[in-house]
């Protein structure tokens, strides 16, 4: 079907959904927020540019979290989403067993996305990723107050290990690697295992913009609300260009035509 809106986001709780919706609005996107998956027959209003669905998958059992998330992402695609975003907390927490990996795995497998990125950071709130490790106000996640959270305890700070504890696929830290190096590693893992995760460092606000531009050609993102704003700004640029020209301007949207060679790239 004809693509109707720029990005569809599934958030793992209502608070996070409200946060990411507000960041999309801040980025300049006309945004609609749903509490739960809309009923059959409901259609996204004309002119909508971003759609956010709030679930309860952060603390659900794994099977239900995956099932609900796939239904939500499927509905977004059916309604015409060009890109997908899985929003989770900036401290990367879910249940003790972990729901982030299973949900992201399932989305990549079901919809055919070879890899995605993990971007939980929100530097303005002290959540940063440096050398592949997640910090809360300068303290490693495992040493922060999240360590003994009653519902979502976090006792590991390295995102590669965190995702591999939950996922069937490996996480690749991009820290200290050239683009040629991490790209080769990603392509090798995807060829051997089918899917993988890339983990960029993100400890300054400017990094979010750089990451969004570097990965403007992928369809499925995962991260916190802060990174969603940077993705949203790129898409808002594209929306403005589309309105002005009504032609294929995908290269303009991310500023690097060679990475985005077709209309849906950005």
Language-model segments: which ranges?
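Acidic, glycine-rich loop-and-beta core segments that form the ion-binding/anion-interacting portion
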Residues: 216-258, 263-266
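N-terminal basic/disordered segments at the start of proteins
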Residues: 2-47, 67-69, 121-124
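Cap/lid and interdomain-hinge subdomains that line or gate substrate/regulatory clefts
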Residues: 3-5, 30, 49, 65, ...
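Short, structured active-site "lid" loops
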Residues: 48-65
